[in-house]
């Protein structure tokens, strides 16, 4: 696929997501809460998870309206997790997406409430009164809940907090980041796939693809934390080193970590090749984008 075609597709889908978020994240919530939510989720971020949802849905000729709802719900969960992760009781960060973190701008209480509200809104978006079949609705809710709950993102963050100052082996580090970061990216792929017809072999291959790009994203994050500055990243660089957190760079070394990211990208491409899907080019390009990004 030509890079211009992919870039055009990315811009169009990002605009679709941005318009949907503008519509669903209301500014009229009580006591200014809507403004805090909009600050947290609008006008920033790569929208990678929504792009994975929509690329997977298109790969299986899925329902575009359902895929857009799934894409927005995943981004709301991601945004809520960033708001909470940045708070002083967690990672205590002051910069996110090139601007002050939510608790720095609005205070800890409003940040906590905004995160809670976005989490709830994510599931409201997935449960419309009409226009989506109950089985699809149930499947999407289950995928997102499992990815974001105790056995997924929240559990991974708990491991992350408990691992400060500790040396994890590669298996333990993979497990932590699979939960904290990887499963939501994998769920994004599977939520998109759920929006259309796909046989068991294709679903298994897409799950493998999602697992590979999910872990690759975190490996690249670890690399960028030591190779880029805060202005490029849009968040505080060097935080993992400063907080003595285990990373793939600290465990494997920079060169080996970079090679590992490329190996995972190759695994993602191999999974797509065995999926039997003829419209998976955008997923392949997203795997490249994840590994080759600079922020």
Identify the meaning behind each predicted range.
Residues 1-25:
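N-terminal amphipathic/basic leader segments beginning at the initiator methionine
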Residues 22, 29-269, 277-291:
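Mg2+-dependent prenyl diphosphate-binding active-site environment of isoprenoid biosynthetic enzymes
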